[in-house]
Protein backbone atom coordinates (compact mmCIF):
# COMPACT_ATOMS: atom_id res chain seq x y z
CA UNK A 1 0.00 0.00 0.00
CA UNK A 2 1.40 3.40 -0.96
CA UNK A 3 1.60 5.62 2.14
CA UNK A 4 -0.92 8.45 2.45
CA UNK A 5 1.83 11.08 2.40
CA UNK A 6 3.06 9.85 -0.98
CA UNK A 7 -0.45 9.72 -2.40
CA UNK A 8 -1.19 13.21 -1.10
CA UNK A 9 2.06 14.56 -2.54
CA UNK A 10 1.14 13.19 -5.96
CA UNK A 11 -2.44 14.46 -5.74
CA UNK A 12 -1.30 17.99 -4.88
CA UNK A 13 1.12 17.95 -7.82
CA UNK A 14 -1.68 16.77 -10.09
CA UNK A 15 -4.64 18.87 -8.93
CA UNK A 16 -3.34 21.51 -6.52
CA UNK A 17 -3.54 21.79 -2.72
CA UNK A 18 -7.08 23.10 -2.14
CA UNK A 19 -9.12 21.02 0.32
CA UNK A 20 -12.88 21.49 0.00
CA UNK A 21 -14.93 21.01 3.16
CA UNK A 22 -18.38 19.49 2.75
CA UNK A 23 -20.24 21.09 5.65
CA UNK A 24 -23.98 20.73 5.03
CA UNK A 25 -25.29 22.79 7.92
CA UNK A 26 -28.93 23.80 8.17
CA UNK A 27 -28.30 27.34 6.89
CA UNK A 28 -26.63 26.10 3.71
CA UNK A 29 -29.37 23.57 3.02
CA UNK A 30 -31.88 26.41 3.33
CA UNK A 31 -29.82 28.68 1.02
CA UNK A 32 -29.89 25.89 -1.55
CA UNK A 33 -33.69 25.66 -1.25
CA UNK A 34 -33.44 22.23 0.37
CA UNK A 35 -35.14 20.86 3.45
CA UNK A 36 -33.20 20.35 6.70
CA UNK A 37 -33.68 16.60 6.42
CA UNK A 38 -31.99 13.47 5.08
CA UNK A 39 -33.25 14.06 1.53
CA UNK A 40 -31.87 17.62 1.56
CA UNK A 41 -28.58 16.40 3.01
CA UNK A 42 -28.22 13.76 0.32
CA UNK A 43 -29.04 16.08 -2.59
CA UNK A 44 -26.66 18.74 -1.31
CA UNK A 45 -23.73 16.48 -0.50
CA UNK A 46 -23.84 14.36 -3.64
CA UNK A 47 -24.24 17.39 -5.93
CA UNK A 48 -21.17 18.97 -4.35
CA UNK A 49 -19.19 15.74 -4.72
CA UNK A 50 -20.18 15.38 -8.36
CA UNK A 51 -19.22 18.99 -9.09
CA UNK A 52 -15.84 19.19 -7.37
CA UNK A 53 -14.44 15.74 -6.47
CA UNK A 54 -13.03 15.15 -9.99
CA UNK A 55 -11.03 18.40 -9.70
CA UNK A 56 -9.60 18.67 -6.18
CA UNK A 57 -6.96 16.63 -4.41
CA UNK A 58 -8.80 16.43 -1.08
CA UNK A 59 -12.47 16.43 -0.10
CA UNK A 60 -13.20 16.90 3.62
CA UNK A 61 -16.71 15.91 4.74
CA UNK A 62 -17.59 17.11 8.24
CA UNK A 63 -19.06 14.09 10.01
CA UNK A 64 -21.10 16.13 12.53
CA UNK A 65 -23.49 17.34 9.83
CA UNK A 66 -24.22 13.74 8.84
CA UNK A 67 -24.42 12.45 12.44
CA UNK A 68 -27.25 14.98 13.00
CA UNK A 69 -29.51 12.64 11.04
CA UNK A 70 -28.48 9.43 12.80
CA UNK A 71 -27.98 6.21 10.87
CA UNK A 72 -29.67 7.59 7.75
CA UNK A 73 -27.27 10.54 7.72
CA UNK A 74 -24.32 8.15 8.10
CA UNK A 75 -25.62 6.17 5.12
CA UNK A 76 -25.38 9.39 3.08
CA UNK A 77 -21.84 9.91 4.39
CA UNK A 78 -20.90 6.42 3.17
CA UNK A 79 -21.99 7.42 -0.34
CA UNK A 80 -20.17 10.77 -0.14
CA UNK A 81 -16.94 8.98 0.77
CA UNK A 82 -17.27 6.28 -1.89
CA UNK A 83 -18.22 8.66 -4.70
CA UNK A 84 -15.48 11.15 -3.81
CA UNK A 85 -12.85 8.42 -3.94
CA UNK A 86 -14.29 7.04 -7.18
CA UNK A 87 -13.83 10.53 -8.66
CA UNK A 88 -10.14 10.46 -7.77
CA UNK A 89 -10.17 12.70 -4.71
CA UNK A 90 -8.59 11.71 -1.42
CA UNK A 91 -11.14 11.77 1.41
CA UNK A 92 -10.10 13.41 4.67
CA UNK A 93 -13.00 12.68 6.99
CA UNK A 94 -13.27 15.37 9.65
CA UNK A 95 -14.30 13.44 12.78
CA UNK A 96 -11.83 14.70 15.44
CA UNK A 97 -11.98 11.35 17.24
CA UNK A 98 -9.78 10.38 20.14
CA UNK A 99 -9.96 7.80 22.92
CA UNK A 100 -7.74 5.13 24.49
CA UNK A 101 -6.90 1.46 24.00
CA UNK A 102 -9.50 -0.74 22.36
CA UNK A 103 -11.77 2.27 21.77
CA UNK A 104 -9.07 4.07 19.78
CA UNK A 105 -8.64 0.82 17.86
CA UNK A 106 -12.39 0.76 17.14
CA UNK A 107 -12.23 4.29 15.70
CA UNK A 108 -9.27 3.21 13.57
CA UNK A 109 -11.26 0.21 12.33
CA UNK A 110 -14.28 2.42 11.61
CA UNK A 111 -12.48 5.00 9.50
CA UNK A 112 -9.19 3.56 8.23
CA UNK A 113 -9.79 -0.13 7.59
CA UNK A 114 -10.56 -0.61 3.88
CA UNK A 115 -13.32 -3.10 4.71
CA UNK A 116 -15.32 -0.50 6.67
CA UNK A 117 -18.26 1.23 4.97
CA UNK A 118 -16.76 4.55 6.16
CA UNK A 119 -13.17 3.81 5.07
CA UNK A 120 -11.39 7.08 4.29
CA UNK A 121 -7.91 8.08 3.17
CA UNK A 122 -7.33 10.11 6.32
CA UNK A 123 -9.14 11.45 9.39
CA UNK A 124 -8.73 14.26 11.89
CA UNK A 125 -7.98 13.19 15.48
CA UNK A 126 -7.96 14.94 18.86
CA UNK A 127 -5.10 14.38 21.34
CA UNK A 128 -6.64 15.56 24.64
CA UNK A 129 -5.93 12.11 26.13
CA UNK A 130 -2.27 12.46 25.11
CA UNK A 131 -0.68 11.83 21.74
CA UNK A 132 0.17 8.24 22.73
CA UNK A 133 -3.52 7.47 23.25
CA UNK A 134 -3.75 7.64 19.45
CA UNK A 135 -1.15 4.87 18.93
CA UNK A 136 -3.68 2.25 17.74
CA UNK A 137 -4.91 4.75 15.14
CA UNK A 138 -1.33 5.54 14.06
CA UNK A 139 -0.53 1.83 13.67
CA UNK A 140 -3.71 1.15 11.71
CA UNK A 141 -2.96 4.12 9.45
CA UNK A 142 0.50 2.69 8.74
CA UNK A 143 -0.95 -0.74 7.96
CA UNK A 144 -3.46 0.59 5.46
CA UNK A 145 -1.52 3.52 3.97
CA UNK A 146 -3.88 6.03 5.56
CA UNK A 147 -3.16 9.42 7.10
CA UNK A 148 -4.00 11.43 10.21
CA UNK A 149 -4.33 15.13 10.94
CA UNK A 150 -3.86 15.79 14.65
CA UNK A 151 -5.36 18.92 16.20
CA UNK A 152 -2.45 21.15 17.18
CA UNK A 153 -2.85 24.92 16.82
CA UNK A 154 -6.32 26.02 15.83
CA UNK A 155 -7.43 29.57 15.12
CA UNK A 156 -10.58 29.70 17.25
CA UNK A 157 -10.22 32.16 20.13
CA UNK A 158 -10.84 29.51 22.81
CA UNK A 159 -8.00 27.22 21.66
CA UNK A 160 -4.95 28.78 23.36
CA UNK A 161 -5.98 27.87 26.94
CA UNK A 162 -5.18 24.26 26.07
CA UNK A 163 -2.90 24.48 23.04
CA UNK A 164 -0.57 27.16 24.47
CA UNK A 165 -0.36 25.53 27.91
CA UNK A 166 3.22 24.72 28.97
CA UNK A 167 4.32 21.11 29.13
CA UNK A 168 6.34 20.13 32.20
CA UNK A 169 9.81 18.78 31.62
CA UNK A 170 10.23 20.00 28.05
CA UNK A 171 13.36 22.08 27.46
CA UNK A 172 12.44 25.71 26.84
CA UNK A 173 8.96 25.23 28.28
CA UNK A 174 7.33 23.90 25.13
CA UNK A 175 3.62 24.20 24.53
CA UNK A 176 1.03 21.48 24.08
CA UNK A 177 0.81 22.44 20.39
CA UNK A 178 4.60 22.25 20.04
CA UNK A 179 4.65 18.85 21.71
CA UNK A 180 2.08 17.54 19.20
CA UNK A 181 4.27 18.81 16.35
CA UNK A 182 7.28 17.08 17.96
CA UNK A 183 5.39 13.78 18.07
CA UNK A 184 4.47 14.20 14.40
CA UNK A 185 8.08 15.03 13.47
CA UNK A 186 9.14 11.72 15.03
CA UNK A 187 6.48 9.74 13.14
CA UNK A 188 7.38 11.38 9.82
CA UNK A 189 11.16 11.23 10.24
CA UNK A 190 11.86 8.53 7.64
CA UNK A 191 9.18 9.49 5.13
CA UNK A 192 9.85 10.76 1.62
CA UNK A 193 8.62 12.79 -0.19
CA UNK A 194 6.07 13.56 2.55
CA UNK A 195 4.99 12.00 5.84
CA UNK A 196 1.48 10.67 6.41
CA UNK A 197 0.96 12.26 9.82
CA UNK A 198 -0.31 15.81 9.58
CA UNK A 199 -1.40 18.64 11.86
CA UNK A 200 -4.41 20.96 11.95
CA UNK A 201 -3.13 24.53 12.16
CA UNK A 202 -5.53 27.42 11.52
CA UNK A 203 -4.92 29.64 8.48
CA UNK A 204 -5.88 32.67 10.59
CA UNK A 205 -3.63 32.22 13.64
CA UNK A 206 -1.72 35.34 12.54
CA UNK A 207 1.73 34.16 13.56
CA UNK A 208 3.36 31.41 15.56
CA UNK A 209 6.68 30.52 17.16
CA UNK A 210 6.04 26.81 16.67
CA UNK A 211 8.26 24.86 14.27
CA UNK A 212 6.05 23.70 11.41
CA UNK A 213 8.87 21.77 9.70
CA UNK A 214 7.71 18.30 10.77
CA UNK A 215 7.82 16.66 7.34
CA UNK A 216 4.06 16.16 7.27
CA UNK A 217 1.08 17.96 5.77
CA UNK A 218 -0.71 20.87 7.44
CA UNK A 219 -4.49 21.13 7.17
CA UNK A 220 -5.22 24.87 7.35
CA UNK A 221 -8.91 25.60 7.97
CA UNK A 222 -10.10 29.17 7.73
CA UNK A 223 -8.89 29.83 4.20
CA UNK A 224 -11.12 32.03 2.06
CA UNK A 225 -14.47 33.16 3.46
CA UNK A 226 -13.18 32.81 7.02
CA UNK A 227 -10.40 35.32 6.38
CA UNK A 228 -7.22 33.39 5.53
CA UNK A 229 -5.54 34.62 2.32
CA UNK A 230 -3.01 33.04 -0.02
CA UNK A 231 -0.46 35.47 1.43
CA UNK A 232 -1.28 34.24 4.96
CA UNK A 233 -0.80 30.65 3.87
CA UNK A 234 2.60 31.39 2.29
CA UNK A 235 3.83 33.48 5.20
CA UNK A 236 2.61 31.18 7.99
CA UNK A 237 3.38 27.83 6.45
CA UNK A 238 6.57 28.49 4.51
CA UNK A 239 8.41 25.89 6.60
CA UNK A 240 5.77 23.18 6.26
CA UNK A 241 6.32 20.23 3.94
CA UNK A 242 2.86 20.60 2.40
CA UNK A 243 -0.19 22.74 3.14
CA UNK A 244 -3.85 22.06 2.43
CA UNK A 245 -5.73 25.36 2.65
CA UNK A 246 -9.26 24.30 3.50
CA UNK A 247 -12.35 26.16 2.39
CA UNK A 248 -16.01 25.30 2.52
CA UNK A 249 -18.42 28.25 2.46
CA UNK A 250 -16.61 29.97 -0.45
CA UNK A 251 -17.33 26.98 -2.66
CA UNK A 252 -20.66 25.72 -1.36
CA UNK A 253 -22.46 29.05 -1.53
CA UNK A 254 -21.96 29.10 -5.31
CA UNK A 255 -24.51 26.28 -5.79
CA UNK A 256 -24.17 26.02 -9.57
CA UNK A 257 -22.00 22.95 -10.36
CA UNK A 258 -20.08 24.62 -13.20
CA UNK A 259 -19.39 27.69 -11.08
CA UNK A 260 -18.21 25.55 -8.16
CA UNK A 261 -15.92 23.59 -10.48
CA UNK A 262 -14.48 26.73 -12.07
CA UNK A 263 -13.90 28.25 -8.64
CA UNK A 264 -11.91 25.29 -7.28
CA UNK A 265 -9.85 24.97 -10.47
CA UNK A 266 -9.05 28.70 -10.44
CA UNK A 267 -8.22 28.67 -6.70
CA UNK A 268 -5.85 25.75 -7.21
CA UNK A 269 -4.18 27.65 -10.06
CA UNK A 270 -3.72 30.69 -7.82
CA UNK A 271 -2.35 28.57 -4.98
CA UNK A 272 0.22 27.03 -7.31
CA UNK A 273 1.27 30.21 -9.13
CA UNK B 1 -37.56 20.24 31.36
CA UNK B 2 -35.95 18.94 34.55
CA UNK B 3 -32.17 19.52 34.39
CA UNK B 4 -29.94 16.49 33.87
CA UNK B 5 -28.23 17.02 37.23
CA UNK B 6 -31.55 16.76 39.06
CA UNK B 7 -32.58 13.68 37.11
CA UNK B 8 -29.22 12.04 37.76
CA UNK B 9 -29.41 12.87 41.47
CA UNK B 10 -32.82 11.18 41.69
CA UNK B 11 -31.69 8.17 39.64
CA UNK B 12 -28.66 7.59 41.87
CA UNK B 13 -30.88 7.76 44.96
CA UNK B 14 -33.27 5.28 43.38
CA UNK B 15 -30.90 2.77 41.78
CA UNK B 16 -27.37 3.54 42.95
CA UNK B 17 -24.42 5.19 41.20
CA UNK B 18 -23.00 2.38 39.03
CA UNK B 19 -22.62 3.30 35.36
CA UNK B 20 -22.43 0.30 33.02
CA UNK B 21 -20.42 0.76 29.84
CA UNK B 22 -21.68 -1.05 26.75
CA UNK B 23 -18.43 -1.67 24.87
CA UNK B 24 -19.04 -4.38 22.27
CA UNK B 25 -15.49 -4.86 21.04
CA UNK B 26 -14.53 -7.75 18.80
CA UNK B 27 -13.04 -9.79 21.67
CA UNK B 28 -16.24 -9.64 23.70
CA UNK B 29 -18.40 -10.58 20.74
CA UNK B 30 -16.16 -13.59 20.24
CA UNK B 31 -16.33 -14.53 23.96
CA UNK B 32 -20.10 -14.45 23.66
CA UNK B 33 -19.95 -16.81 20.65
CA UNK B 34 -21.15 -14.05 18.34
CA UNK B 35 -19.83 -12.92 14.97
CA UNK B 36 -17.86 -9.68 14.62
CA UNK B 37 -20.64 -8.24 12.48
CA UNK B 38 -23.81 -6.15 12.72
CA UNK B 39 -25.94 -9.14 13.77
CA UNK B 40 -23.51 -10.00 16.57
CA UNK B 41 -23.37 -6.36 17.66
CA UNK B 42 -27.15 -6.14 17.81
CA UNK B 43 -27.63 -9.38 19.74
CA UNK B 44 -24.94 -8.45 22.24
CA UNK B 45 -25.98 -4.86 22.83
CA UNK B 46 -29.71 -5.45 23.12
CA UNK B 47 -29.27 -8.45 25.44
CA UNK B 48 -27.11 -6.34 27.74
CA UNK B 49 -29.66 -3.51 27.69
CA UNK B 50 -32.52 -5.87 28.48
CA UNK B 51 -30.58 -7.44 31.35
CA UNK B 52 -29.28 -4.33 33.11
CA UNK B 53 -31.04 -1.12 31.94
CA UNK B 54 -34.03 -1.65 34.29
CA UNK B 55 -31.63 -1.81 37.26
CA UNK B 56 -28.93 0.85 36.81
CA UNK B 57 -29.11 4.63 36.86
CA UNK B 58 -26.79 5.16 33.89
CA UNK B 59 -25.99 3.13 30.77
CA UNK B 60 -22.96 4.29 28.77
CA UNK B 61 -22.75 2.95 25.20
CA UNK B 62 -19.35 3.53 23.55
CA UNK B 63 -20.12 4.96 20.13
CA UNK B 64 -16.85 3.80 18.54
CA UNK B 65 -17.90 0.16 18.67
CA UNK B 66 -21.09 0.98 16.75
CA UNK B 67 -19.36 3.35 14.29
CA UNK B 68 -17.15 0.40 13.27
CA UNK B 69 -20.12 -0.97 11.34
CA UNK B 70 -21.09 2.29 9.64
CA UNK B 71 -24.72 3.30 9.24
CA UNK B 72 -25.98 -0.16 10.16
CA UNK B 73 -24.03 -0.05 13.42
CA UNK B 74 -25.47 3.40 14.16
CA UNK B 75 -28.96 2.00 13.58
CA UNK B 76 -28.23 -0.53 16.35
CA UNK B 77 -27.01 2.32 18.57
CA UNK B 78 -30.32 4.13 18.03
CA UNK B 79 -32.14 1.07 19.38
CA UNK B 80 -29.74 0.71 22.32
CA UNK B 81 -30.39 4.32 23.33
CA UNK B 82 -34.17 4.11 22.93
CA UNK B 83 -34.53 0.80 24.76
CA UNK B 84 -32.25 1.86 27.61
CA UNK B 85 -34.29 5.01 28.17
CA UNK B 86 -37.55 3.07 27.92
CA UNK B 87 -36.22 0.84 30.73
CA UNK B 88 -35.73 3.87 32.95
CA UNK B 89 -31.95 4.27 32.66
CA UNK B 90 -30.29 7.55 31.78
CA UNK B 91 -28.14 7.21 28.66
CA UNK B 92 -24.69 8.75 28.75
CA UNK B 93 -23.42 8.31 25.19
CA UNK B 94 -19.64 8.11 25.14
CA UNK B 95 -18.68 9.99 21.97
CA UNK B 96 -15.95 12.42 23.16
CA UNK B 97 -16.95 14.95 20.51
CA UNK B 98 -15.58 18.45 20.27
CA UNK B 99 -15.35 21.07 17.54
CA UNK B 100 -16.10 24.77 17.05
CA UNK B 101 -19.01 26.98 16.02
CA UNK B 102 -21.64 25.48 13.75
CA UNK B 103 -19.93 22.07 13.93
CA UNK B 104 -20.20 21.99 17.72
CA UNK B 105 -23.84 22.97 17.26
CA UNK B 106 -24.32 20.05 14.85
CA UNK B 107 -22.93 17.61 17.43
CA UNK B 108 -25.29 19.11 20.01
CA UNK B 109 -28.20 18.63 17.60
CA UNK B 110 -27.12 15.06 16.87
CA UNK B 111 -26.92 13.89 20.47
CA UNK B 112 -28.91 16.24 22.72
CA UNK B 113 -31.90 17.41 20.68
CA UNK B 114 -34.90 15.22 21.60
CA UNK B 115 -35.95 15.03 17.94
CA UNK B 116 -32.69 13.32 16.91
CA UNK B 117 -32.65 9.53 16.46
CA UNK B 118 -29.54 9.48 18.69
CA UNK B 119 -30.93 11.76 21.42
CA UNK B 120 -29.29 10.91 24.75
CA UNK B 121 -29.50 12.23 28.29
CA UNK B 122 -25.82 13.20 28.30
CA UNK B 123 -22.64 12.84 26.25
CA UNK B 124 -18.91 12.96 26.83
CA UNK B 125 -17.06 15.85 25.17
CA UNK B 126 -13.40 16.71 24.51
CA UNK B 127 -12.06 20.24 25.15
CA UNK B 128 -8.82 20.25 23.11
CA UNK B 129 -10.14 23.27 21.17
CA UNK B 130 -10.73 25.10 24.47
CA UNK B 131 -13.64 24.79 26.86
CA UNK B 132 -15.42 27.73 25.19
CA UNK B 133 -15.48 25.85 21.87
CA UNK B 134 -18.11 23.65 23.55
CA UNK B 135 -20.47 26.60 24.26
CA UNK B 136 -23.07 25.59 21.64
CA UNK B 137 -23.19 22.13 23.23
CA UNK B 138 -23.52 23.64 26.72
CA UNK B 139 -26.38 25.90 25.59
CA UNK B 140 -28.19 23.05 23.84
CA UNK B 141 -27.80 20.89 26.95
CA UNK B 142 -29.39 23.64 29.05
CA UNK B 143 -32.27 24.00 26.60
CA UNK B 144 -33.11 20.31 26.62
CA UNK B 145 -32.21 19.39 30.21
CA UNK B 146 -29.27 17.29 29.06
CA UNK B 147 -25.84 16.82 30.60
CA UNK B 148 -22.19 16.81 29.58
CA UNK B 149 -19.10 15.05 30.89
CA UNK B 150 -15.97 16.94 29.88
CA UNK B 151 -12.65 15.09 29.67
CA UNK B 152 -10.48 16.47 32.47
CA UNK B 153 -8.13 14.07 34.27
CA UNK B 154 -8.01 10.60 32.78
CA UNK B 155 -6.05 7.66 34.12
CA UNK B 156 -4.34 6.51 30.92
CA UNK B 157 -0.57 6.96 31.10
CA UNK B 158 -0.44 9.27 28.06
CA UNK B 159 -2.91 11.81 29.47
CA UNK B 160 -0.69 13.98 31.69
CA UNK B 161 1.31 15.56 28.83
CA UNK B 162 -1.83 17.53 27.95
CA UNK B 163 -3.94 17.44 31.13
CA UNK B 164 -1.11 18.39 33.52
CA UNK B 165 0.25 21.15 31.25
CA UNK B 166 0.37 24.56 32.94
CA UNK B 167 -2.02 27.25 31.82
CA UNK B 168 -0.52 30.73 31.38
CA UNK B 169 -1.96 33.52 33.48
CA UNK B 170 -3.72 31.34 36.03
CA UNK B 171 -2.80 32.12 39.65
CA UNK B 172 -0.72 29.32 41.13
CA UNK B 173 0.08 27.90 37.70
CA UNK B 174 -3.07 25.86 37.28
CA UNK B 175 -3.21 22.85 35.02
CA UNK B 176 -5.34 22.22 31.95
CA UNK B 177 -7.35 19.69 33.99
CA UNK B 178 -7.83 22.21 36.81
CA UNK B 179 -8.97 24.85 34.33
CA UNK B 180 -11.61 22.46 32.96
CA UNK B 181 -12.86 21.87 36.51
CA UNK B 182 -12.97 25.65 37.06
CA UNK B 183 -15.11 26.09 33.95
CA UNK B 184 -17.45 23.36 35.21
CA UNK B 185 -17.65 24.96 38.67
CA UNK B 186 -18.83 28.19 37.02
CA UNK B 187 -21.49 26.39 34.95
CA UNK B 188 -22.80 24.48 37.98
CA UNK B 189 -22.68 27.38 40.45
CA UNK B 190 -26.44 27.92 40.77
CA UNK B 191 -27.53 24.29 40.48
CA UNK B 192 -29.21 22.31 43.24
CA UNK B 193 -29.10 19.48 44.23
CA UNK B 194 -26.52 18.73 41.50
CA UNK B 195 -25.18 20.49 38.41
CA UNK B 196 -25.60 19.04 34.92
CA UNK B 197 -22.02 19.60 33.78
CA UNK B 198 -19.71 16.78 34.79
CA UNK B 199 -16.09 15.75 34.39
CA UNK B 200 -14.35 12.54 33.36
CA UNK B 201 -11.77 11.68 36.03
CA UNK B 202 -10.19 8.23 36.05
CA UNK B 203 -10.87 5.96 39.04
CA UNK B 204 -7.24 4.81 38.90
CA UNK B 205 -5.38 8.15 38.91
CA UNK B 206 -4.09 7.31 42.41
CA UNK B 207 -4.24 10.82 43.82
CA UNK B 208 -4.74 14.37 42.67
CA UNK B 209 -4.26 17.94 43.87
CA UNK B 210 -7.17 19.15 41.74
CA UNK B 211 -10.29 20.45 43.46
CA UNK B 212 -13.11 18.06 42.58
CA UNK B 213 -15.76 20.12 44.43
CA UNK B 214 -17.34 21.64 41.32
CA UNK B 215 -20.95 20.80 42.14
CA UNK B 216 -21.26 18.44 39.20
CA UNK B 217 -21.03 14.69 38.66
CA UNK B 218 -17.77 12.81 38.08
CA UNK B 219 -17.69 9.94 35.60
CA UNK B 220 -14.97 7.62 36.90
CA UNK B 221 -13.93 5.01 34.31
CA UNK B 222 -11.61 2.24 35.39
CA UNK B 223 -13.74 0.93 38.23
CA UNK B 224 -13.72 -2.83 38.74
CA UNK B 225 -11.85 -4.99 36.24
CA UNK B 226 -9.54 -2.10 35.35
CA UNK B 227 -8.34 -1.79 38.94
CA UNK B 228 -10.36 0.94 40.66
CA UNK B 229 -11.88 -0.17 43.98
CA UNK B 230 -14.73 1.18 46.09
CA UNK B 231 -12.08 2.43 48.52
CA UNK B 232 -10.35 4.31 45.65
CA UNK B 233 -13.62 5.91 44.66
CA UNK B 234 -14.35 7.08 48.24
CA UNK B 235 -10.82 8.35 48.85
CA UNK B 236 -10.35 10.11 45.50
CA UNK B 237 -13.79 11.57 45.05
CA UNK B 238 -14.83 12.43 48.59
CA UNK B 239 -15.15 16.10 47.63
CA UNK B 240 -17.19 15.50 44.49
CA UNK B 241 -20.92 16.20 44.47
CA UNK B 242 -21.69 12.83 42.86
CA UNK B 243 -19.61 10.02 41.40
CA UNK B 244 -20.49 7.48 38.73
CA UNK B 245 -18.02 4.60 38.95
CA UNK B 246 -18.05 3.15 35.45
CA UNK B 247 -17.50 -0.49 34.69
CA UNK B 248 -17.90 -2.52 31.53
CA UNK B 249 -15.85 -5.72 31.33
CA UNK B 250 -16.83 -6.85 34.87
CA UNK B 251 -20.46 -6.93 33.83
CA UNK B 252 -20.31 -7.92 30.17
CA UNK B 253 -18.09 -10.96 30.66
CA UNK B 254 -20.81 -12.57 32.80
CA UNK B 255 -23.04 -13.13 29.72
CA UNK B 256 -25.96 -14.70 31.59
CA UNK B 257 -28.72 -12.04 31.95
CA UNK B 258 -29.65 -13.01 35.51
CA UNK B 259 -26.02 -13.04 36.61
CA UNK B 260 -25.41 -9.62 35.01
CA UNK B 261 -28.50 -8.23 36.73
CA UNK B 262 -27.52 -9.65 40.14
CA UNK B 263 -24.00 -8.27 39.73
CA UNK B 264 -25.10 -4.70 39.03
CA UNK B 265 -27.68 -4.74 41.84
CA UNK B 266 -25.11 -6.09 44.31
CA UNK B 267 -22.45 -3.59 43.18
CA UNK B 268 -24.89 -0.72 43.63
CA UNK B 269 -25.69 -2.00 47.13
CA UNK B 270 -21.97 -2.10 47.98
CA UNK B 271 -21.41 1.38 46.57
CA UNK B 272 -24.22 2.75 48.72
CA UNK B 273 -23.38 0.92 51.94
Curated annotation (Swiss-Prot), chains A, B:
Protein EC: 4.1.1.23
One GO biological process term: 'de novo' UMP biosynthetic process
Catalyzed reaction equations: orotidine 5'-phosphate + H(+) = UMP + CO2
Top-level division of the source organism's lineage: Bacteria
UniProt key word Lyase: yes
Alphabetized Pfam families for the sequence: OMPdecase (PF00215)
Annotated metabolic or biological route of this protein: Pyrimidine metabolism; UMP biosynthesis via de novo pathway; UMP from orotate: step 2/2
A GO term, aspect molecular function: orotidine-5'-phosphate decarboxylase activity
Keywords: Decarboxylase, Lyase, Pyrimidine biosynthesis
Disulfide pattern: none
SMART domains: OMPdecase
Active site per database record: 96
Family recorded in the similarity comment: Belongs to the OMP decarboxylase family. Type 2 subfamily.
NCBIfam families from the UniProt entry: pyrF_sub2 (TIGR02127)
Name of the protein this chain belongs to: Orotidine 5'-phosphate decarboxylase
Taxonomic lineage from the root: Bacteria, Bacillati, Actinomycetota, Actinomycetes, Propionibacteriales
Name of encoding gene: pyrF
Amino acid sequence: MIPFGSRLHAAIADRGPLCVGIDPHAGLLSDWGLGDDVAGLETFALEVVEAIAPYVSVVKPQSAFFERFGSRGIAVLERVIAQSRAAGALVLLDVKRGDIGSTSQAYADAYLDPTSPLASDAITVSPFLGFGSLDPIVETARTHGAGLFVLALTSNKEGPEVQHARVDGVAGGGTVAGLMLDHLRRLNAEASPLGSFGAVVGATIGSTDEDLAFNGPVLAPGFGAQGGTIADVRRLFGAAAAVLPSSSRDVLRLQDPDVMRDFVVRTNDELRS
